[in-house]
Amino acid sequence: MRRLLFLSLAGLWLFSPAAAAQLPGLISQPLAGGGQSWSLSVQTLVFITSLTFLPAILLMMTSFTRIIIVFGLLRNALGTPSAPPNQVLLGLALFLTFFIMSPVIDKIYVDAYQPFSEQKISMQEALDKGAQPLRAFMLRQTREADLALFARLANSGPLQGPEAVPMRILLPAYVTSELKTAFQIGFTIFIPFLIIDLVIASVLMALGMMMVPPATIALPFKLMLFVLVDGWQLLMGSLAQSFYS
């Protein structure tokens, strides 16, 4: 009973004018250009909320999708479904994504974050300026056919230029282009390992060893070939160059 009385008194105090005056206000201030500048509390809330969209941004708006798909196809081509493990591939993909996206991140930092942290521009202007380098990166990797497809599905009419492409069309078109590019790279990776599989299977058939799994015999030859050509360096270097070629 005492606890209930205490909670009731505490609730009444919180809703009193004196307590409300001590709480920080969530206000916005008008700017000279006609916009609004939100208080630090609102900006912090928006920033923390935006962090929940970070995985989606990583998958949909960076080079991560192409890299992780190529790594998965490489593992299938080698015939090692559990080596390297998923954690290692994810770590490599994240680091390679960071290196590839570093010019875009630097431009966002210089053009958007620094002026916003110095209170030279509003949050809306910072968001607009920060989105421009990311849009330019995505447009460079997106095929015109994919843009036309999603523009037709959205009934938006013919696109007038790169600046007129809305994000709701650019995002799925970019992901579709990344999937196609990743599968093209994966096809190129599969060819030498497929030749090894065919040769090993033919040799085993000629020797009458039909009960021996060809994948077991072919695996060391695949690993030896991949190591001899310095496959990891070749693959990661080619992936990085594919975004700026």
Curated annotation (Swiss-Prot):
Primary subcellular site in the record, as a coarse category: membrane
Source taxon at top rank: Bacteria
Signal peptide as annotated in the record: 1-21
Transmembrane parts of this sequence: 45-65, 88-108, 185-205, 209-229
Swiss-Prot/TrEMBL keywords: Bacterial flagellum, Bacterial flagellum biogenesis, Bacterial flagellum protein export, Cell inner membrane, Cell membrane, Membrane, Protein transport, Signal, Transmembrane, Transmembrane helix, Transport
Classification via Pfam families: FliP
Protein's membrane topology: Multi-pass membrane protein
Cystine bridges: none
Cell location: Cell inner membrane; Bacterial flagellum basal body
GO terms under cellular component: bacterial-type flagellum basal body; plasma membrane
Gene Ontology BP annotations: bacterial-type flagellum assembly; bacterial-type flagellum-dependent swarming motility; protein secretion
UniProt-listed NCBIfam families: fliP, PRK12797.1
Other facts noted in the record for this chain: For insertion of FliP into the membrane, cleavage of the signal peptide is important kinetically but not absolutely required.
Function recorded in the entry: Plays a role in the flagellum-specific transport system.
Family: Belongs to the FliP/MopC/SpaP family.
Protein name: Flagellar biosynthetic protein FliP
Gene that specifies this protein: fliP
